[in-house]
């Protein structure tokens, strides 16, 4: 499935707009990860533990969005937007992704009437 932040895909015609698709993931802060991150912050550098958690959360949200687009018989998602939101006094983070599921010409999927 093609996924892009742009509203169109160059060289491909959009036959049908299937609708909005979203994916969300919520991750909680781990106390041990927080301790390691604070040590990293003191000595400088990047926190691999946090980066890995964010990448996993992002990938899960995108996969959820792709699954929803597949159920709508889409073969691409355009106009994708990715957001990160911290809530619960910094104890939780939500990764959300949204876009428009579409059926591109020359791809798999069945045009809906």
UniProtKB/Swiss-Prot annotation:
Query: Which Gene3D superfamilies does its entry note?
Result: Hypothetical protein apc22750. Chain B
Query: What InterPro entries is this protein classified in?
Result: UPF0145_dom_sf, UPF0145_YbjQ-like
Give the similarity note. Belongs to the UPF0145 family.
Its recorded name reads: UPF0145 protein SynWH7803_1684
